[in-house]
Amino acid sequence: MKGKRVIAGILLVGIIAVTLTGCKHTDSSKKETEKSVITLGSDNYPPYNYLNEDGVPTGIDVELATEAFKRMGYQVDVVQINWEKKKELVESGEIDCIMGCFSMEGRLDDYRWAGPYIASRQVVAVNENSDIYKLSDLEGKNLAVQSTTKPEGIFLKRTDERIPKLGNLISLPHWELIYTFLGKGYVDAVAAHEESVVQYMKDYDIRFRILEEPLMVVGIGVAFAKEDDRGICEQMDRTLEEMRQDGTSLKIIEKYLDDPQKYLEVDDLGY
């Protein structure tokens, strides 16, 4: 009987061990599955990120992110976010990163960055019959920007001596509204990424005039939380550079923008 008890005990221990090992494997697999999807937060901002006719996210950043994360072994879930709360969302972990024509300029200490992967001009646009031809002509004028964007900071801080004092700076929550305000004459000018202005004119068959003198040439990057030490940001940085070098980024950008090569000239941006 004693021998039978010992054998039974050994069998019981073995069964428990196998069960626990199975549970551990299941938990591990679950964690790996959870890690395999990167949640990318972005605003609706054509041509970088927008919903196509089928309601599926598409655009320059969506295609670049999908390819980059695929090379890294991840799937990407692109979600539309409240752009004004982007920092809060990435720091809380609700999203893994921010990628939506997001300028690195003036924000280097706020996030952990991958990039720059695109160079973009911040410009001022006016109606075709406007008497505004250079930045100094904006003195006393009313100008609209999307809130929390780089142009808003440029006109609020006025650290650049070329930037005059406006009559009013109108900050609006959505990028489309700034063009509506300009088209209806509620403001004299708008400031935004040049690609956004060009895309809006194309989509709505409307003509604005872009001032030749840019506000700034900025680098576009992917932002992760400052405390994110998973190494994904650094891997993303290397992968985006590989895509720039092997021609993948050029092929993606040329689907959306004319003269795509100029947007990849990021080496002299100083980041």
What does each of the following model-derived ranges do?
Residues E53, A65-Y74, P151-P173, M201-D205:
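Ligand-binding cleft/hinge of the Venus flytrap
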Residues K24, V62-R71, N129-I132, S136-K150, ...:
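Extended ligand-binding regions for polar small-molecule ligands
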Residues K30-C101, S171, Q235-M236, D246:
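Extracytoplasmic small-molecule ligand-binding "clamshell" domains
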Residues T66, Q75-D137, R209, P214:
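Acidic, polar ligand-binding/catalytic clefts
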Residues M1-I10:
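Bacterial N-terminal signal peptides that target proteins for export
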Residues T19-G22:
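C-terminal motif of bacterial Sec signal peptides marking the signal peptidase cleavage site
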Residues S42-N44, A119-V126, K202-R238, D259-Y271:
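Periplasmic-binding protein-like
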Residues K85-E88, C101-D110, I154-K157, F181-V217:
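A ligand-binding cleft/hinge motif common to bilobed small-molecule-binding domains
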